[in-house]
Regions:
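Outer-membrane beta-barrel strand-turn architecture
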Residues: 23-28, 56-60, 91-97, 127
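Transmembrane beta-barrel strands of outer-membrane/channel proteins
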Residues: 5-11, 33-37, 52, 66-70, ...
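Oxyanion-binding "anion nests"
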Residues: 10-41
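Outer-membrane beta-barrel "beta-signal"
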Residues: 115-127
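Repeated loop/turn-to-beta-strand initiation elements of outer-membrane beta-barrel proteins
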Residues: 2-5, 28-33, 61-64, 95-101
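Gram-negative outer-membrane beta-barrel proteins
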Residues: 11-15, 39-43, 72-76, 107-111
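Outer-membrane beta-barrel architecture
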Residues: 21-23, 53, 88, 102, ...
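Transmembrane beta-barrel architecture of outer-membrane proteins
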Residues: 17, 47-49, 84-86, 118-120
Length: 127
């Protein structure tokens, strides 16, 4: 199974961003993920952002996708993170054309009320 792993770093003034990313594929199931820590992006806080995605080609032109995203604007404060599960399908009916069908389910940590689910249809083309 092919494996990809890497890291990134950026510093500009007081702002600093560093992260790791990776991915692998086995028997058609593909995983990609990334974790980043930012210093001084939101005020003077240390922030954390991450995502993890699994994709599986059911047949040519149809992929099922499950993704988890997390953003914590201040890792030193408990219960201030936003997380989201995304479930959907990527349909490729023609070359260079994609239709994304997704349901997004967002959760706020702490005692806050969670937002209603979001449903997305996106048309995407490239060249």
């Amino acid at each position: 199974a092919p494996i990809l792993f890497g890291s990134s770093f950026m510093k500009e003034g007081d702002f600093q961003l560093m992260g790791v990313f990776g991915g692998t594929s086995f028997l058609g199931l593909t995983w990609i993920g990334e974790v980043d820590i930012a210093e001084n992006w939101v005020d003077d806080n240390s922030s954390l952002a991450s995502f993890s995605e699994f994709s599986y080609p059911v047949k040519q032109g149809l992929h099922f996708v499950v993704r988890y995203d997390l953003f914590d604007e201040d890792i030193n404060i408990k219960n201030n993170a936003i997380s989201r599960w995304t479930v959907g399908a990527d349909v490729f009916p023609l070359s260079f054309f994609e239709i994304k069908l997704q349901g997004r389910f967002t959760s706020l940590s702490g005692d806050g009320e969670n937002p209603e689910p979001e449903y997305l249809i996106q048309f995407h083309t490239w060249f």
